[in-house]
């Protein structure tokens, strides 16, 4: 029986956990007799109800990013270094007791504060193959290169990883070249495509629109987990109130602060066409039925929109988590903006300018997009270019192949 250990980091939001669980499900379908253990500090693990029967998780003490550089443990009254040491010891204990055949690490080659520096060699010493999964875009290439050089990531990649899976496509970013990987490391890189929940059956769009009472136009706004989504949804609700004939569904996500969610609901009071909800069980059906979607530029949200071929209006977050008060300054977080710009160049979505955090500007852009969408509908919807959204399946195939292959570790 093969044993797989998946480590997913618990930075603010749900993206890393959701992406990892999509891959876990695809892997478990291929290896129903394998054991798959997920280790993370993400609070989102507590809400997971649909793990495969041959999978389970280990909850680590949580570390989340804050608006300022660095991280802080949100629950245990311990110093960050103590929580980091505790997490590292728990992971080492899991490796020793579980003895995985494969260790998959999500996006952070050394974990938080280098907590995997002892875990990876121990896993390999016990015979595990080790794989790093990278987001389509980590950050600006020059920032990644500087950070990886400072933290010793290049040496770790060379010595401690057998394979690097990129959860994106080379047309968006050639990670090997952009991040300065050596030729031997680039030979270990596999582009898997975007990781999504898969192509499940969608509800009938006309039926869903009738259920929502849509008379003219349906607009859906979604901000992923929602922890950083308040500025966009605040602007969106006020923008909808400036336009006529709109039915709007506003999905705040489970991580939005209760006070912020209450404020969004207050802004919607008196407008019968605006529904504010924390969660929608079948969000893809709502996105597919909408005349327009307004979203942030996080990985999971964008990947699902690509899978649906829904041309969304995307307003990327370019400030640090919790730091929107300073969001009028220069861009300090590049991931969402770079992703949006690259996909916009391919005609797959439309990036909104930062001014759309003001309701009047967002209302103008939304009205323009709906007018354009109406014109397209009258003359036939223009086809949207295909982009690979089978990342979970292809990543699972790569992992199975590595598990079944013979030979020593790559160095």
Cite the ranges covered by each PLM segment.
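Conserved nucleotide-sugar phosphate-binding/catalytic loop shared by glycosyltransferases and other
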Residues: 6-8, 26-82, 86-93
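Donor-nucleotide binding loops and adjacent catalytic segments primarily
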Residues: 194-292, 337, 355-356
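Conserved nucleotide-sugar donor-interacting segment of glycosyltransferase catalytic cores
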Residues: 90-158
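C-terminal amphipathic helix plus adjacent low-complexity
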Residues: 364, 370-411
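A nucleotide-sugar donor-handling region in carbohydrate enzymes
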Residues: 135-230, 258
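A short, glycine/small-residue-rich beta-strand->loop->alpha-helix junction that serves as a flexible
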Residues: 8-21, 44-47, 230
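A donor-sugar binding/catalytic signature common to diverse glycosyltransferases
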Residues: 282-338
